[in-house]
Amino acid sequence: MRDSHPVEQTVGIEYYVTETDGTGGRLRDRPADFRVREREAFGADCRPLDADPGSYPHLVFRATLREWDTNDFASAVSNALGVSRERVSWAGTKDKHAVTTQLFSVRHDDAALPDLDGADIEPIGRAGRPVLFGDLAGNEFELVIRDPDRPEHAEATAAELCDFGGGEAGVPNYFGTQRFGSRRPITHRVGLDVLDGDWEAAAVRYVCESSEREPERTQEVREGIDADRDWAAAGERLPGSLRFERAIANRLAEGAESPDDYRAALEELPSNLQRMFVNAAQSYVFNRILSERLRRGLPFDEPVVGDVVCFSDSDGNPDPDRTQTVTESRLETVRRHCERGRAFVTAPLVGTETVFGDGEPAEITREVLADVDVSPTDFELPGEFGSSGTRRAVLVTTDLTVEQEPLTLSFSLPKGSYATVVAREFLKADPEALS
């Protein structure tokens, strides 16, 4: 186990689990170097394209996107069709600098969809409900590592990951740095402001806090707005690409006197982005819990007394709604379930209904929460900001293959797990090389 990159440590990712020196190199030298294809799980809800739009109002389509941010693509579709952005939904958010194939739906009577640069769009049917976030079994990845310094180290790293995963390649199920903002990893800090009830700090941080990884001009604009708080001018000064920051600034220009004004400004964002802030805070706490579990030497592929495990669903993936706290008397039985892939050790994505478990795992969670000054009751928040919490497996295993010339990693992951968390163990590089 070795210390991670300093940028990763700011989002709770404190260690690598492999000791082999990194291959070096970089991902995403070109979009085709990072390919993602969803393993779809929506077929049973889909009807033919000629189904009655009155009964099946949601048009379901598959899109292969090249260098499209998911939110930007949804906005482009809604604008082209002349419908509300909230009518467009999707199964999973993907990386922009990639070639991705994923499922969307739009509430729209006409089966015709727009032609957009960098997008191949295939209508596949109609449904009585929208495609919702999480309506997928997982994702298949093919990642090319360009210009590695030590490509021969990849096989040794893969072998170490198999040891960590208990026979199959495994990594801690960290949330990757892109969860928090690839260039400006602050969404968890905005979320912590929200949990603290400081709506002003949250809105101001999102608009004004700069990062040295951003263009110099963008840094200057953010810092200038922070200094003068001239929200009326801010909407014009911010680059057009920062449309969410502009939306917040424009709302604050109408009034920035009370906490409710700042909360209303954050509510100008699409609902999924409103949820993103508290979700990122939960993810940060989760990463911290995993790092402390690693530091203490607790296993990831099998439980200890006090762990909360969840059981597998019909697809063999973790089902966070079916859980059990591991007692001394049940330890060996649950270990066998984990060994056979029927149960998974979990940690909490903390919310109002979080169950801590017992023993050392619960102690870790409480220590991390105390350190970030968060409690489950803090998640009792209005609208999209509140969360009851859930659980997430601490380990993710995969059918990893490694090929040389060019160095290529191929694997699949369950929904919600990050390809860069696998890739980082190989490159051991600045997270910017992964993004």
From Swiss-Prot:
What GO terms describe the biological role, i.e. biological process, of this protein? tRNA pseudouridine synthesis
Question: Origin, by domain of life?
Answer: Archaea
Lineage of the organism: Archaea, Methanobacteriati, Methanobacteriota, Stenosarchaea group, Halobacteria
Write down the EC number.
Answer: 5.4.99.27
To which protein family does this belong? Belongs to the pseudouridine synthase TruD family.
* Name the record gives this protein: Probable tRNA pseudouridine synthase D
Q: Which NCBIfam families match?
A: PRK00984.2-3, tRNA_TruD_broad
The UniProt entry annotates the active site at: D95
Q: List the disulfide bonds.
A: none
- A molecular function (GO) term: RNA binding
